[in-house]
Amino acid sequence: MLIQFLTKIFSNHNNRILKKFKKIVLSVNKLEKNFEKLSDKELQAQTELFRLRLRNGETLDDILPEAFALVREASKRVFSMRHFDVQILGGIALNKQCIAEMRTGEGKTLTSTLPAYLNALNGKGVHIVTMNDYLARRDAEKNTPLFEFLGLTVGLNLSEMSFFSKRKAYLSDITYGTNNEYGFDYLRDNMVFSPEERVQRKLNYALVDEVDSILIDEARTPLIISGPSEDSSELYKEINKIVPFLNSQKKEDSDIFCGTGDFSIDEKSKQIYLTERGLIKVEKILFDKKLMNTGESLYSSNNIILMHHVLSALRAHKLFVRNVDYLVKDNSVIIVDEHTGRTMPGRRWSDGLHQAIEAKENVSIKNENQTLASITFQNYFRLYEKIAGMTGTAETESFEFNSIYNLDTIVIPTNRKMIRKDFPDLVYMTEKEKINAIIQDIQKCIKLNQPVLVGTVSIEKSEIISKELLKLNINHNVLNAKFHAKEAEIIAQAGKPGSITIATNMAGRGTDIVLGGNLEVELNKYKNITSRKIEEIKKKWQSEHDLVVSAGGLHIIGTERHESRRIDNQLRGRSGRQGDTGSSRFYLSMEDSLMRIFASDKIVHMMKKLGLAFNEAIEHSWVTKAIENAQKKVENRNFDIRKQLLEYDDVINEQRSAIYSQRNKLIDARDIKLMIYDIFKDVLKKNIILYIPKNTFHDKWNVTDLKDKLNIDFYLNAPILDWINIEPNLTDKKIIKRIIDFARINYKNKEILIGSNNMRIIEKIIMLQTLDSLWKEHLAAVDYLRQGIHLRGYAQKDPKQEYKRESFNMFSSMLELLKFEVVSFLSRINSSYAKKYIDLNKHLVITHNNTMKISRNSPCLCGSGKKYKYCHGSL
């Protein structure tokens, strides 16, 4: 009842917004005849007129109807394609910072040209975000003629591009690229030493294609730039040898820490826990291998790393499966994306898991990496002034889009009525029975000349179906998502009569399956083609198209339900595009991962009680409902994980923003002389008062230790005793000022020897290098804190609040250490070392035009809300 009520509310909300948008569509339609009358030159001149109007104070919303009418007319002339009204609706939604749900085949690529053109007019840049390099290149090449006709520049940002190519791409009005590349470029830009090394401009408008995949499926995977850490490959090998001696906890043992096994597995959270028995056994083995001292515990602070290695090894063996979670190729472990089924060369699991899997598979173990910079997609895309997205499946995730990104989801109606038949699920007891039924369904479709797309959840499942088809000599294509361009070509022709295509989750996503095959792809095979040949190909295509339509269109077979209903809908959505006929059916078994882990025991008991014969399936609404409930459980759990990840990352994100902001100010400044003087004053004062109490005279001062401190840490030999002898009534305030003045004179004398220009260069480089080094260490420390913070819950403390408090304290300490390290280094540097230092860092030296001065009344960058002068002084 409540669900129906909420559905009605959201449905009404969608209809109300569409009603408003349709009024704008009418305005666009009214302008169509006016733009049809314009010549090409007059049409092209509109872009500069729009820009002038924006400079004079009009908004993007003010010029939207005219801009969209212009793009529609330009598209008719350049592509011979007219934007449908539903595509105009989609364009309006995307400009209003919404998620536009547009079904497969509704023309999302053409729709994107509308908001992309409009938002590029202000000159701040538009980033169109795709899932892979192939789609970025394809869409850029496809839409460039239209944008260039309208006077806009288009850039392409791909991995492995040179600095100059990237810089040019980002300076374009519209830039195409992948989510990974945009994110990594942002991180790299915040690691440079001069403004000239940055490639990105200020982040203005992001238009994300397949937005559900990028902002939800990949939200749990942070982007990380890392550097090599110490070599510990031998330790991974030794720990790997322990795993065969450990036995898994029996499922009936309810207590994960007790029982007859050595470890327990939580498949839902993909975690492993040692039992008391397992702990004793592991400790004994480690004693025998001399990896741990007798009498110590794995839980001792100095053995935490060993415990981490043991758990990583167990996870590698018991939770990560070859050809499902990863492949082994060319002596390397290559991750398989759990959502797309695509391999991800170059990506590595963190926290030592990747090394543990390399040890398990007996391939060369690469060194662990230390994080230099990281950000989640959630926080990266929230940096944009405006963000919008398109996908065929967003409605089931509308709450998450709204709560995390503040984006409304608008379901755009289809241009033609959807007539695909979605048959009920068939549920079998065993995997073998299910596969038999799938093969029979495929054979039936072949007899009808009906094309089939078989969707699987992993490469391993694809290969099982493929082997069964090979036994029967049935020709088919298998897409394991290794080559994006090739997979798109195969998917494009998956609508040919009788063709059988097996694909993992989202292989080929972004490419339409046209009934009868893709005519455009077929024509592009020929370089020099006669009009007679074109007619011949078109006639053949029409014949095959009609044959497929009469056979029932594209038939979708799902080999099991995915964890998310959305991914099931994506698979179904490959059929029935633009009002085409089509059908879909999911085949399930009680051995499927979803059913085994998340479905209730009631279903299992009911299936057993029915006493089904071999190869007999159950088809019942009650079972379908139970499966949906299992999916909802997983969706809710995954949402909670993503939300929690964001809550924790928000803490470090505030610190990251503060550090990057300060770092950029340092880079953009001509010199930081005034800032260095303030830091000197602050650091010296904080160190002096440790030995000179407030409101005291010299008889209460620890002069000997103070002199040692100043000499050792700051290379400062201040004549404090002489000052006291000359002026016995010196107050604490006067002596502090005198020491600071002495240090300043000392520094100025050093500057004369080294040279002012050289000193300014050294100050900036030291500041940046020290900041980067400490930030790297801070990220590692916070990561360790994050991993163990959940244990605070056992002490009746809120882990999130504890994490916020401790990470803030760590950040504050890092800032204090930064100032100390900078002052200490600059105090010690001499003229001969200064020359060597500059020679070593010549590649970092850039001069600028403006001087940076930090206001003491500005808010402190640490996020405390206090002024600089009351919190972290001059920094």
Swiss-Prot record:
A Pfam family assignment: SecA_DEAD
Reactions that this protein is recorded to catalyse: ATP + H2O + cellular proteinSide 1 = ADP + phosphate + cellular proteinSide 2
EC number annotated for this UniProt entry: 7.4.2.8
Alphabetical list of InterPro entries matching this protein: Helicase_ATP-bd, Helicase_C-like, P-loop_NTPase, SEC_C_motif, SecA, SecA_CS, SecA_DEAD, SecA_motor_DEAD
GO CC terms, sorted: cell envelope Sec protein transport complex; cytosol; plasma membrane
PROSITE patterns tied to this protein: SECA, SECA_MOTOR_DEAD
Keyword annotations: ATP-binding, Cell inner membrane, Cell membrane, Cytoplasm, Membrane, Metal-binding, Nucleotide-binding, Protein transport, Translocase, Translocation, Transport, Zinc
GO biological process, one term: protein targeting
Induction summary: Repressed under conditions of excess protein secretion capacity and derepressed when protein secretion becomes limiting. This is regulated by SecM.
UniProt remark on cofactor binding: May bind 1 zinc ion per subunit.
Record: residues binding Zn(2+): 860, 862, 871-872
Cofactors that this protein relies on: Zn(2+)
Disulfide-bonded cysteines: none
Enzyme kind, highest EC tier: translocase
Localization of this protein: Cell inner membrane; Cytoplasm
Membrane topology: Peripheral membrane protein
Molecular function terms, GO-annotated: ATP binding; metal ion binding; protein-exporting ATPase activity
Binding site for ATP: 87, 105-109, 512
UniProt subunit comment: Monomer and homodimer. Part of the essential Sec protein translocation apparatus which comprises SecA, SecYEG and auxiliary proteins SecDF-YajC and YidC.
Family affiliation: Belongs to the SecA family.
PANTHER family in the record: CHLOROPLAST PROTEIN-TRANSPORTING ATPASE (PTHR30612:SF0), SECA INNER MEMBRANE COMPONENT OF SEC PROTEIN SECRETION SYSTEM (PTHR30612)
Entry function: Part of the Sec protein translocase complex. Interacts with the SecYEG preprotein conducting channel. Has a central role in coupling the hydrolysis of ATP to the transfer of proteins into and across the cell membrane, serving both as a receptor for the preprotein-SecB complex and as an ATP-driven molecular motor driving the stepwise translocation of polypeptide chains across the membrane.
Protein's name in the database: Protein translocase subunit SecA
Organism this protein belongs to: Buchnera aphidicola subsp. Acyrthosiphon pisum (strain 5A)
